[in-house]
């Protein structure tokens, strides 16, 4: 990790330079049995394609605001880094009526709320392997249809300002530099200090604590996250087995860290 990195996108670029093959995000959904592992290189490729979609097809520019109506998921993590790459401010669970772009998951309530956005509207099916909707929701482009053809490399049209708003979550707005600063501090508190550290996080993405444990702190520390959704459906025995098989070195569940 480079000390001069001042945005999450900078952190990802540094990781890609130093250790592209290491796992960055390993995602489990215990409601569906899905497991997806993304190396730094694979994750960065998804982020680049998504940033090209955001900057090109969706015409997003630095300073624009994107309402993100998605749960803790590997594709949500990709969107967070894509927005950082373009300089778009992500509002977690933000009001679509006030946003320039809205990105929604498949939940009917989220799609209904997202229709209030007067700008571009994109929907994610959140199906295994990044699958598409059988039919895209009315008024939305399907992310899984739009993203594969995007370029594998991304260059922003304008430089990203580390001191511009980058993330709004649970009533707090942070600049890109503040996200990086907080993530670095959290990495130490979460025990992400040794090489090869792997944090299992079952926290939702609706708070800074969830976003940090589930993405930003492991990224800042040069470690990796095992991101678990619907883990209440996993038995204690199943969790113990996962911790062993994934070589987990620490866990973040609710307010507890171990």
Language model feature labels by segment:
Residues 183-198, 205-252:
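Conserved AMP-binding/adenylation subdomain of ANL enzymes
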Residues 53-93, 195-216:
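Conserved AMP-binding/adenylate-forming
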Residues 25-60, 168-192:
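Conserved AMP-binding/adenylate-forming core of the ANL superfamily
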Residues 1-8, 29-33, 41-42, 72-75:
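Long terminal accessory regions outside catalytic cores
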Residues 101-190, 244-247, 251-258:
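ANL superfamily adenylate-forming
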Residues 68-69, 76, 80-111, 120-129, ...:
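Short beta-strand->loop structural element characteristic of the AMP-binding/adenylate-forming
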Residues 17-19, 59-61, 94-100, 114-118, ...:
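Flexible, charged surface loops at secondary-structure boundaries
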Residues 2-26, 157-158:
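A short N-terminal helical cap/helix-turn-helix that marks the beginning
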